[in-house]
């Protein structure tokens, strides 16, 4: 049995051209995914940086310095005037 060429077979050029289009499409998809991941990472780093900058640990109070000193002296006087009562549990 011999294989005879038929007239309805697809030419060689069409096969290579179609596979070339698929390769270009796959490259575009891979490039898009890599770009999306890269943009997401940059966004996360920026958000973490902004959060850490805003919550860096320096706290401001609206109390005057005189009020702070007065409250400290009151606490010291209060603890000196009241005798400590110790409770013992049995």
From Swiss-Prot:
Membrane topology of this protein: Single-pass type III membrane protein
Location (main, coarse): membrane
Chain ranges on the Cytoplasmic side, renumbered to this chain: 49-90
GO CC terms: cytoplasmic vesicle membrane; plasma membrane
Extracellular side: 1-27
Keyword Hydrolase among record annotations: no
Keyword set includes NADP: no
Keyword annotations: Cell membrane, Cytoplasmic vesicle, Membrane, Transmembrane, Transmembrane helix
Residues annotated as transmembrane: 28-48
InterPro entries: SMAGP (IPR043243)
Localization per Swiss-Prot or TrEMBL: Cell membrane; Cytoplasmic vesicle membrane
Similarity remark: Belongs to the SMAGP family.
Function: May play a role in epithelial cell-cell contacts.
PANTHER family from the UniProt entry: SMALL CELL ADHESION GLYCOPROTEIN
Protein's name in the database: Small cell adhesion glycoprotein homolog
UniProt organism field: Xenopus tropicalis (Western clawed frog)
Gene that this polypeptide is encoded by: smagp
């Amino acid at each position: 049995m011999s294989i005879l060429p038929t007239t309805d077979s697809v030419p060689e050029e069409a096969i290579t051209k179609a596979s070339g289009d698929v390769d270009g499409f796959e490259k575009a998809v891979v490039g898009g995914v890599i770009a999306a991941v890269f943009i997401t990472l940059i966004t996360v780093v920026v958000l973490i940086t902004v959060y850490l900058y805003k919550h860096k640990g320096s706290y401001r109070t609206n109390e005057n310095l005189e009020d702070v000193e007065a409250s400290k002296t009151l606490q010291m006087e209060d603890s000196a005037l009241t005798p400590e009562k110790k409770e013992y549990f049995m």
